[in-house]
A protein has these predicted regions:
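Beta-propeller domains with acidic blade repeats across secreted/periplasmic ectodomains
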Residues: 1-172, 180, 184, 188-191
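Intrinsically disordered or highly flexible coil/loop and linker segments, enriched in small
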Residues: 37, 195-198, 212
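Active-site-adjacent structural elements in folded domains
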Residues: 48-51, 202-203, 216
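Amphipathic alpha-helical scaffolding segments comprising HEAT/armadillo-like alpha-solenoid repeats
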Residues: 163-172, 193-205, 224
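Short inter-helical turns and helix N-cap capping residues of alpha-solenoid HEAT/ARM repeat scaffolds
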Residues: 177-178, 206-209
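Alpha-solenoid HEAT/ARM repeat scaffold
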Residues: 182-183, 211-214
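Hydrophobic core/packing positions within alpha-helical solenoid repeats
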Residues: 188-189, 213, 220
Length: 224
C-alpha cells in the first residue's frame, strides 16, 4: 500500500499494488480498524479468515490516493476516492455506495497520465497529478512532470494562509465545504489552544455539516 484515501468521516480506502508478483492482484479495500485483510497470503488461500476486499481489480500498480471533496468541482467528480495506478497510467475514481457497515464500489477511469505516481489538490481546488513517465525503477531527474487539472468554468480564488487568519476566521474555516480547507484549519488550530472552546462549539452545532462537526471533534481532541 502506497497511499490511503480518507473521507471526512474517517472511512479509509486503499488500492493495492502488485509489485510482489505471484498473482497478487490489485484489491480495493475499505479499511476497518484492526481488520485483517490477508496480505500477502491469507486472501489467496484462507479467505474465511479475513475481511474481504470490496473488489479484486486484476493486475496493476496502485500508488497515490486522495478523497476529493472540493466545492469547486462538479458533483460528478466530487466526494469520491481517487486512486493512481502507475501500471495502467490512470487516475481512477472509485464510486463508493454505502452498503450496511461497508460499501460497494465501481471503478471508473478519470484521467490518463503516463505512469501516474501521486495526486493532490490545493486549497483553491486545483488538482495535480505527478507523472513518472519513463523515469525507470531508480528514478531519473530528467524525467517526469506535474500536470494541473481544473474543471470547466473554474475560477481561481486565492486560499488564505491559515497562519495569518485571526482566531474567529480560522475556526470558521472548519465549516468550509472543502476538505482541504478544513484540514488546513485543523492543523493551524492545534497551535492555538486558547480557542478550544470555540472549536468544541462547532462540534456540537447541529446546523453545521456533519463533515465540519467531525473535523471539529478530531481537532478538539488533539487540543486537549
Amino acid at each position: 500500500i502506497y497511499d490511503v484515501a480518507i473521507d471526512p468521516l474517517m472511512n479509509m480506502f486503499t488500492r493495492g499494488n502488485t509489485n510482489d508478483g505471484g498473482g497478487w492482484n490489485i484489491r480495493f479495500i475499505h479499511h476497518i480498524q484492526s481488520g485483517q485483510y490477508g496480505y500477502p497470503m491469507l486472501f489467496k488461500h484462507f479467505t474465511d479468515e479475513i475481511i474481504p476486499a470490496l473488489q479484486d481489480l486484476g493486475g496493476g500498480s496502485g500508488t497515490g490516493a486522495l478523497f476529493l471533496q472540493e466545492p469547486t468541482w462538479p458533483e460528478k467528480f466530487n466526494n469520491v476516492p481517487m486512486m493512481c495506478d502507475w501500471g495502467r497510467s490512470q487516475l481512477i475514481i472509485h464510486r463508493v455506495t454505502p452498503d450496511g457497515a461497508s460499501f460497494t464500489q465501481k471503478p471508473e477511469n478519470f484521467i490518463r497520465l503516463a505512469q501516474i505516481a501521486d495526486v493532490d489538490v490545493d486549497g483553491s481546488g486545483r488538482l495535480y497529478g505527478a507523472a513518472w513517465d519513463g523515469a525507470g525503477y531508480s528514478g531519473n531527474p530528467k524525467k517526469g512532470y506535474v500536470q494541473r487539472y481544473v474543471p470547466k468554468g473554474w475560477k481561481f480564488r486565492r486560499f488564505p494562509d491559515p497562519a495569518k487568519l485571526k482566531d474567529k476566521a480560522l475556526v470558521e474555516l472548519l465549516r468550509s465545504a472543502s476538505a482541504t480547507a478544513r484540514t488546513a484549519a485543523s492543523q493551524e488550530l492545534l497551535n492555538r489552544p486558547a480557542v478550544a472552546k470555540d472549536v468544541a462549539a462547532v462540534a456540537v452545532d447541529r446546523t453545521a455539516s456533519l463533515e465540519s462537526r467531525v473535523a471539529a471533534i478530531f481537532t478538539y481532541k488533539q487540543m486537549e
